[in-house]
Amino acid sequence: MATKNSNLQRWLTGIVLAVVLLLIIFLGSLELFAAAIMLIIIIGMWEYNSIFFGPGFLKEKTEGLILAVFIPVTVLFGNEQWLTALLAFAVMAVFIVFLWKISEDSFDMSSVNKVLFGMLYIPLLTSHFIMLRKLDRGIEWVMLVLVIGIVGDTVALYVGKFFGKKS
């Protein structure tokens, strides 16, 4: 159960990060915004890899991190055709790396599933913020998505605390 101190720390951290994020969104260039999104993607992939793979699996983790960098770069500098080509290449690359691990004793595709899901879930979906920012009124679209997400998460947190199961 969260104490008042941890709740205060959560709010203070959120406010500081919100100020930095708002400065980048409103005053930063598209490239700075994309760099911030890329940093968030890399941190997210690092966490994803540590949760889903655990120790070992260096090839899969490296593959996921490399793809996590290429996807937002392609979204920033390329177009939809480039992104589609990169995703097709990425799927093939994941399977090729998997082929090197196959032995006659075992055939476990879970590492392929984890890499592909991580690639689609974190870098591809988060790169949509860059796509939104590139639109004519991109700043407004980015802010709308962020406000909807933040309000939804905050309401869920406090509704869960209020109506949640008391142990």
Task: Show where each model-derived region lies.
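Membrane-embedded alpha-helical bundles of polytopic integral membrane proteins
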Residues: 2-167
